[in-house]
Each structure stands twice: as C-alpha cells, then as structure tokens.
A protein has these predicted regions:
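C-terminal motif of bacterial Sec signal peptides marking the signal peptidase cleavage site
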Residues: 6-9
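Metalloprotease/metallohydrolase-associated module, dominated by Zn2+-dependent proteases
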Residues: 27-29, 43, 120-150, 166-206
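Metzincin-family zinc-dependent endopeptidase catalytic domain
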Residues: 47-154, 166
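Catalytic glutamate of the conserved HExxH
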Residues: 154-162
C-alpha cells in the first residue's frame, strides 16, 4: 500500500504513480456510477467546518455525504509526548469503512507519520494512493488552524492522491509536492492534466 503524506512530510514517488489520463477508455465507459465521497468526523470536529468542506467538494464532485455518527480517535494511536495521533493508524481504520465508497476522515487533532526526521513527524494529511481513502487535520503541527481556503486545498490534494494522482510538477497545481513547506497560497486549482485525470474518474471539474 503506497501512502502519500501532505506537507511537512510529503513522500510520494512518481515511479509508483498511476499515469495521468492513461486509463483505458473501455474501462471508463463501463463505469455506470462514481463512488460517493463520505466525510467522517472524528470526535468534536466542527459540523460547520465539515459542511463548508462538503459544499466546496460538491462543486467538483457529484456525490458527497457527511456521516452523522462521529468516529472516536483511538487511544492506541495517540502519542502523549507529542500530543498527536498516528495518521497512518487512522488511515488503516478508515480503509475498513470504505465499502465501495471513497472515505475522507476529518480531525482537529494534530496527526503524524514516521519518517527519517522523526518517528512522530507532524503532517497535514495522509492518503493511500489510488484506494479512495485519506485523512486530513485542520490543525497544523504548530497548533495553528488552517484557514478555510487552505483546508479546502488540503482536502483536494489528499483526495487527488486517494483517487490515483501522485505529486505534480506544476507549481500552481493542488497536487504540487509541498517539500516540507506550505504552498497553498500559490495553488489556485488542479492543473489541466490532473483535472483531466480526475474527470475521467467521475469528477466534474471545469
């Protein structure tokens, strides 16, 4: 399972990516429906914030829902010393909920993923490439909250990964590799190539 993490620990590899726009046409034509994107809220993630994300997503994707019952953040994924949760652990649990739909977990807690710099390296989001499963946090590792605009872009980035997109070389695309930084201010949309790939997956990006 190839896992992509967003910002502060973004490690996707283009050699492992699905080629953009190369899905056989006969496969595309067989798709009668697209998966619903289900937003799962952890603990006290604000309903108003979830609704904002859902409305933004509905502008580019035809089937979006917010699950009514919140999920509980598992204690076994909590790191007390750093006061943050394992993003990879949450991702593994979310995969079990997929059942044919796309799943995105939403949390207000800081999440982490081990890398060469730290076993509890803070990240903004994590997804499993091409499996339609991901999780994002509205709280940065610094403890500051994302603006609504940046949170929407983070959501689009992780969903792009989960639908099969790897990082993009276009510095103004949602899918650009943040390289341990924050490039949201320079990414207004998906580039034409990434947009075409997602539209072949059922998205409605104009």
């Amino acid at each position: 399972m190839l896992i992509c993490t967003t910002l502060m620990a973004c490690q996707g590899g283009k050699d492992n990516a699905l080629s953009k726009g190369t899905e056989p046409m006969e496969t595309i034509k067989k798709k009668a429906t697209v998966p619903n994107i289900s937003l799962y809220l952890y603990d006290d993630f604000p309903a108003q914030k979830a609704q904002m994300l859902a409305e933004a997503l509905k502008k580019v994707y035809p089937s979006v829902s917010i699950q009514k019952e919140p999920l509980v953040l598992p204690k076994e994924y909590y790191n007390k010393e750093r006061n943050r949760y394992s993003g990879t652990g949450l991702l593994i649990d979310l995969i079990k909920l997929r059942k044919g739909n796309a799943v995105l977990g939403l949390t207000d807690e800081v999440i982490f993923k081990a890398n060469e710099l730290s076993p509890t390296y803070g990240i903004f989001g994590v997804s499993s490439l091409g499996t339609c499963v991901g999780v994002i946090s509205s709280t940065r590792p610094s403890g500051k909250q994302h603006s609504n605009d940046h949170l929407v872009k983070l959501m689009m980035h992780e969903l792009g990964h989960s639908f099969g997109l790897d990082h993009c070389s276009n510095q103004h695309c949602f899918m650009v590799d943040a390289e341990h930084g924050n490039k949201f201010s320079q990414t207004p949309s998906f580039c034409n190539e990434c947009q075409a790939f997602l539209n072949n997956k059922g998205w409605k990006i104009k």
